Amino acid sequence: MMRSLHSLRRMSGTVLALMLAAGLPLSAAQAQPAKPAPKGDQKPATPAPSEQFVDGIAAIVNKDVITLREVREASKLASADLQKRGIQVPDERTLQKQVLQRLIMERLERQEVDRMGIRVDEAQVDQAINMIASRNKITPAAMRAEIEKSGVTWEQYRKSLRDDIRMDRLRQRAVDANIIISDAEVDAFLKDQERNPAAAQATRAPAPQQPQPQPRQPAQSGPAMLVLAQILVRVPEGSSPDQVAALRKKAEGLLARAKKGDDFASLAAANSDGPEALQGGMMGARPLDGWPDLFVKAAGSLSAGQVSGLVQSGNGFHILKVVDRAGGGQPAQAARPAPAPAPQQPSSFQEGPSVAAPQGPVRVTQTHARHILIKTSTVMTDDQARQRLEQIRERLQGGAVKFEDMARQYSQDSTAPQGGDLGWVNPGDTVPPFEAAMNALQPNEISPPVLSPFGWHLIQVLERREHDVSDEVQRMRARQLLFERRAVPAFEDWLEQLRSQAFIDNRLEKQERLEQNNR
């Protein structure tokens, strides 16, 4: 449970922040009327594919159909978003090709979400909204007014937020759960940091937030932060040597253009196979040690604005650009495998703590707690789960049974064999609804049923203490950096596997090849 709770807490501090560009989630922010395309030396638009296809089908993804109308509408939104970012919009055919690739991957992910039965109800969306508003020190009503002022309806925003939470939970299950960082790896990482004092600052994270934190002051020093963008030329699984050579040649051509001074974001938007292509290739910011080793070796010593050489990975050929770098202490969006908004559109809603931290002891109030979790499903509704926990609570308060026995019998959490014991919990270790309910309890008190993204809980506080967690925080930060280092390639591997196992009939791509052969 603790690993899952921490995973969602990390999601709330990163992905939810990344969804907000100028106060909007990325997908919602794109749901605005498209502005006229900029004039200039842009190539004349080729005939729209809708003129060439009678059936109106752009692609078939397993059993789902993506229509040409969907592609056209998504292309208008993508065009408006690129213009807002100051990125040159590709010609219509290229833009639709890129948009269709994104729609295909989104459809594959949505199919996986449905297959795994991942659901997000209204209460969980409300919790996410309250969390975002709280961390940005505004009320949910003020946040709603800000969003609606931008032209996005509240219903659109909620739907976008729900979709993004579902997708993030999919990534947690499919990718995050398979990344295991051992204690030995953490020990080795910390020893390496000791030999490199400058980099060691990356593991000095701020203390977990206590209730009612004071506003942060900008830090003056901290770990090296690196903001990267990429162009990815994907090499499909099972490609022949000739195909790999052709793709390498394509990547080398793009590299030459980037080195010559062509706009990197425009090149990425028109040519990259990466999931962040239509954001100009932006992957966000991380401490240097948080990027994959391949990326650090290729771009770690480059200055802002410089472009790396060709980087080959298991997924293809990468071209990296250092968008910005800093000695630390400057607010930066935390990068994840999911696409991130470009930096020229800073979010008005900032989330997550600074990487840098003050030196010295880090004292927090720890809570020793235990819980019983009942998950909801198609056979266990919210009402049924809550009623069962209320019955268990009545028996516990009557003294007829022991908490640990009820946890072993009924809890669906991994802590059930230990009687639901969570051990000593630091502030911020659990999701906000769980933590708020836990903090309101006196020692030995049992909460009413509490709803979290994982299900319904009964929580009992056993005791509290003041504790110096400096070493624990440093180890936790080291583990997080090691995790982030693996997350990007792991996510790309998962996307490639998802694609290779699917039936995809890309009719726009077929039409383009047919036209090329007839020339």
From Swiss-Prot:
Q: Any idea where this protein resides?
A: Periplasm
Where on the tree of life does the source sit, at the highest rank? Bacteria
- Domain PpiC residues, every copy: 223-324, 364-463
Extract the ranges annotated as region (Disordered). 31-50, 196-221, 328-361
The EC number(s) given in the record are 5.2.1.8
Free-text domain note: The PPIase activity resides only in the second parvulin domain. The N-terminal region and the C-terminal tail are necessary and sufficient for the chaperone activity of SurA. The PPIase activity is dispensable for SurA to function as a chaperone. The N-terminal region and the C-terminal tail are also required for porin recognition.
Descriptive protein name: Chaperone SurA
Q: Which organism is it from?
A: Bordetella parapertussis (strain 12822 / ATCC BAA-587 / NCTC 13253)
Name the gene for this chain: surA
